[in-house]
Design a protein with these regions (language model features):
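Active-site acidic carboxylates
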Residues: 1-94, 115-121, 147-151, 160-174, ...
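Histidine-anchored nucleotide/phosphate-binding helix
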Residues: 31-35, 133-145
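Active-site-proximal beta-strand/loop segments in catalytic clefts of secreted hydrolases
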Residues: 45-48, 98, 128, 155
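Glycine-rich phosphate- or other oxyanion-binding loops that anchor nucleotides, phosphorylated ligands
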Residues: 92-110
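Short, small-residue-enriched loops and turns at beta-alpha junctions
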Residues: 102-103, 157-161
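Glycine-rich anion-binding loop/nest that anchors nucleotide
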Residues: 121-133, 151-157
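A two-mode feature
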Residues: 127, 137, 177-180
Length: 189
């Protein structure tokens, strides 16, 4: 079984307060991944912060308000939201996470007997930001499922800068996370 985890494809990371041209360039690849994956094998995370984000530990280190719950920036970008709607992905598979990595995501994966029993399990991650939330969730998946193939599709990920994306991919490879399509990112062209 192959699980797809779509990480934080939210307006604020694509076109909003922390948006980049690299993030905008991967939207189509993320949508393609969603379209080719059965709905029951898709999980989605959303970075979720309170209004007082700037007073949190993260806010002190990254003083840019983003993904504030209830705002447009918190919503998934329209193309991704539409693809998930067309696939009829269950709302229970959408995880609001207040941190970079989601323990709730891991708990949901571990509570599924089919996933736990699968000796050929593959967990693929796509989304934003390669060096923060994709990296954190990929490492959590590798720790929770050490015998699974944890895969990151580099062509469906972007980071704050191309250099930080490359650094994150190198770090994930050290942790035995498979990186596919590195060098084929649409924003490299």
């Amino acid at each position: 079984m192959k699980i797809l985890i779509v990480v934080d494809m939210q307006n604020d990371f694509v076109t909003g307060s922390l948006g980049t041209k690299e993030a905008q360039a991967i939207v189509e690849n993320v949508v393609c991944k969603i379209k080719e994956t059965p709905a029951e094998q898709i999980y989605v995370t959303q970075d979720t912060h309170p209004e007082q984000y700037l007073q949190t530990k993260e806010g002190l280190h990254l003083p840019v308000a983003h993904c504030i719950e209830g705002t447009n920036g918190h919503c998934l970008c329209p193309a991704v939201e539409q693809a998930l709607k067309e696939k009829q992905v269950d709302a229970a598979r959408k995880i609001q996470k207040p941190t970079f990595g989601s323990m709730e995501l891991i708990e949901k994966l571990r509570s599924d007997e089919k996933i736990v029993a699968d000796s050929n399990l593959q967990i693929e991650l796509v989304g934003l930001c390669t060096g923060i939330c994709v990296l954190s969730n990929a490492i959590l998946c590798k720790a929770a499922f050490p015998e699974a193939d944890v895969i990151v599709d580099a062509a469906a990920c972007a980071c704050v800068t191309p250099a930080s994306h490359d650094t994150a991919l190198a770090a994930m490879k050290l942790c035995q996370i498979e990186v596919e399509k590195e060098g084929k990112e649409p924003w490299r062209n």
